[in-house]
Amino acid sequence: MGRGRVQLKRIENKINRQVTFSKRRSGLLKKAHEISVLCDAEVALIVFSSKGKLFEYSTDSCMERILERYDRYLYSDKQLVGRDVSQSENWVLEHAKLKARVEVLEKNKRNFMGEDLDSLSLKELQSLEHQLDAAIKSIRSRKNQAMFESISALQKKDKALQDHNNSLLKKIKEREKKTGQQEGQLVQCSNSSSVLLPQYCVTSSRDGFVERVGGENGGASSLTEPNSLLPAWMLRPTTTNE
């Protein structure tokens, strides 16, 4: 059978208690040294006997340095804990403030909408009225400004369109003027060419001969062709149109 579990309790016999303390103290100091060497850990062990006698072990015999490090660790840990507690309290307080602020804003919103007015006093109603009047004035001022800006933009657009139309009309007039000048030049050229051409007048005589009057020399010349060779309608005098 295996060994049963030993129940830990105070040893009543004084001698047995001292012997057990001596054995276990030596084992504890040995274990502390082993863990310090094997694991490269800083170990500080302090043991007081029932009579108040001190037994200790420290890595590299630097008990004070290890204890100072322990104190610094405890202080920083307490600071962190205190800071966390303080921040938690601040968050709780800030949440309460924000919640109250939201409630006030929601109440003001309902009042501006004309709701929940029964609970307001005369002074609060007058203050609400002044706030609404100021808001209406601000809205009207902004509306008038927006209308003025819109009208100004439309006027600028209208002026730009008028300038564009005037430019188009000017171009059309210039083109018409140029076209008229070209037509006038063509008419003058036509008139001058018709003046330079010689004018002739063909007449018929009773003898049956055709006579041509005019020409470059302004004289008359007779054609010797007999009348029988030309029809009568070809013997009509010709006229020139200027």
Swiss-Prot record:
InterPro entries: MADS-box/MEF2_TF, MEF2-like_N, TF_Kbox, TF_MADSbox, TF_MADSbox_sf. The keyword Coiled coil applies. Transmembrane segments: none annotated. It is found in: Nucleus. Residues 3-57 form the MADS-box domain. One of its GO terms (cellular component) is nucleus. Pfam families: K-box (PF01486), SRF-TF (PF00319). Probable transcription factor that promotes early floral meristem identity in synergy with APETALA1 and CAULIFLOWER. Is required subsequently for the transition of an inflorescence meristem into a floral meristem. Seems to be partially redundant to the function of APETALA1 and CAULIFLOWER in the up-regulation of LEAFY. Is also required for normal pattern of cell division, expansion and differentiation during morphogenesis of the silique. Probably not required for fruit elongation but instead is required to prevent ectopic activity of IND. This is Agamous-like MADS-box protein AGL8. It comes from Arabidopsis thaliana (Mouse-ear cress).
